[in-house]
Amino acid sequence: MLFMVIERFKDRDPIPVYRRVRDPGITFPEGLKYLGSWIEPNFDRCFQLMECDDARLLQQWVLANARDTGMTFEIVPVVTSAETREVVAPFLDENPLAGGRCSTS
């Protein structure tokens, strides 16, 4: 599964977090894969895309790496737009006024 991890920097101060990344390094439990991250220009939030099959790995990661940084975390399960298109496709031809699928007969 994919998870969007939204990290909030305490007082918009990224220095403790980046110091943590540089000095002892960030560790990831086996099975948790970091895919990428994006930082807001004002240093308010960091958005990290992570992948794992067990959400407990995210809990382990937070506890092992972030307790002394002042960050808060929101972890949101997400689905790619390509996978969502597959789910939505069968419903695209429904007639909302008829309350079901369009009939061609």
PLM regions with names:
Residues 24, 64-68:
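Conserved short hydrophobic interaction patches
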Residues 48-50, 61:
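Functionalized membrane-embedded alpha-helices
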